[in-house]
């Protein structure tokens, strides 16, 4: 029998879709939701399920940014064949995304047991939500928001890509929150920071989802819940991406900072009263 039923998969898929690209921690929200629904958050099958439905959210990025991705991949292909094409920013950017993914892959494989063990604690999630909100607020205040997407460099990509490790080790910190905060500190504007976070998430999250697929299927999650959760994640994430890009073009990240603190304190309360464990 599957440890997650179709109804629960719909809820979790929606939570994943809404929160994956918002700087509020999808992992934290999934763990809270799983706990409230009585799903064992530390079960290998559940951890695998959470990683697999991320692929739906990533598919939404691929569809939403299809023209940009085709342009970048095409430039990369032309550059591989012709040296004269290698000065184009899109060619360089494709390599930067690849290089910037290497650190999180190394840490993810090396620290897998730690990440899925002690660091998966809801106490860690709560603390990371609150601490991460402080980092995000400081980054938004410090950043001069003067550099656009075309101004990004190899250094930017590596620093922003490496910051994903924070969310890997401290679920609740938020991959989007870590990458956007780092980009803001590097003086990228909010839209450029958000778009860079999207592109850097494609290889990292896709790889994690495919890697965990065997655990999800082999240890207690049925095909139907996986499929439903992934599809719901895709649909909801597409809408979330569209909304976020419009929001950051006109607003600061303060709303996310406040929301993270509220959720972090709420989670501490639920843990302290024994509602969640």
UniProtKB/Swiss-Prot annotation:
Annotated HAMAP family: Undec_diphosphatase
Signal peptide: none
Membrane-traversing stretches: 46-66, 95-115, 119-139, 165-185, 191-211, 216-236, 256-276
Keywords (A to Z) from UniProt: Antibiotic resistance, Cell membrane, Cell shape, Cell wall biogenesis/degradation, Hydrolase, Membrane, Peptidoglycan synthesis, Transmembrane, Transmembrane helix
GO-annotated cellular components: plasma membrane
Cell membrane keyword on record: yes
Pfam families hit by this protein: BacA
GO biological process: cell wall organization; peptidoglycan biosynthetic process; regulation of cell shape; response to antibiotic
Similarity remark: Belongs to the UppP family.
Record-linked PANTHER family: UNDECAPRENYL-DIPHOSPHATASE (PTHR30622:SF3)
Remaining remarks: Bacitracin is thought to be involved in the inhibition of peptidoglycan synthesis by sequestering undecaprenyl diphosphate, thereby reducing the pool of lipid carrier available.
Molecular functions (GO terms): undecaprenyl-diphosphatase activity
Taxonomic lineage from the root: Bacteria, Bacillati, Actinomycetota, Actinomycetes, Kitasatosporales
The name this protein goes by in its record: Undecaprenyl-diphosphatase 1
Membrane-related topology note: Multi-pass membrane protein
Coiled coil ranges: none
Catalysis: reaction(s): di-trans,octa-cis-undecaprenyl diphosphate + H2O = di-trans,octa-cis-undecaprenyl phosphate + phosphate + H(+)
EC category: hydrolase
Main location: membrane
Protein task: Catalyzes the dephosphorylation of undecaprenyl diphosphate (UPP). Confers resistance to bacitracin.
Localization terms from the record: Cell membrane
């Amino acid at each position: 029998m599957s440890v997650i039923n179709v109804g629960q998969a719909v809820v979790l898929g929606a939570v994943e879709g809404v929160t994956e690209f918002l700087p509020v921690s999808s992992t934290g929200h999934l763990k809270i939701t799983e706990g409230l629904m009585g799903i064992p958050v530390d079960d290998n099958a559940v951890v695998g399920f959470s990683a697999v439905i991320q692929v739906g959210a990533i598919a939404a990025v691929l569809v939403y940014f299809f023209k940009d991705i085709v342009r970048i991949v095409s430039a990369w292909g032309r550059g591989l064949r012709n040296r004269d094409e290698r000065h184009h920013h899109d060619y360089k950017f494709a390599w930067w995304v690849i290089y910037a993914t290497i650190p999180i892959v190394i840490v993810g494989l090396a620290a897998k047991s730690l990440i899925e063990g002690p660091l998966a604690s809801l106490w860690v999630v709560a603390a990371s939500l609150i601490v991460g909100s402080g980092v995000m607020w400081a980054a938004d205040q410090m950043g001069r928001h003067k550099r656009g997407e075309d101004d990004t460099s190899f250094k930017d990509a590596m620093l922003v890509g490496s910051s994903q490790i924070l969310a890997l080790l401290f679920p609740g910190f938020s991959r989007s929150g870590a990458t956007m905060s780092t980009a803001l500190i590097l003086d990228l504007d909010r839209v450029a920071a958000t778009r860079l976070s999207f592109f850097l998430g494609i290889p990292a999250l896709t790889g994690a989802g495919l890697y965990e697929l065997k655990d999800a299927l082999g240890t207690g999650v049925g095909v139907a819940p996986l499929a439903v959760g992934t599809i719901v994640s895709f649909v909801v994430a597409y809408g979330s991406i569209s909304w976020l890009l419009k929001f950051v073009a006109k607003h600061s990240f303060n709303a996310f900072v406040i929301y993270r603190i509220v959720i972090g304190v709420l989670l501490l309360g639920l843990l302290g009263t024994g509602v969640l464990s």
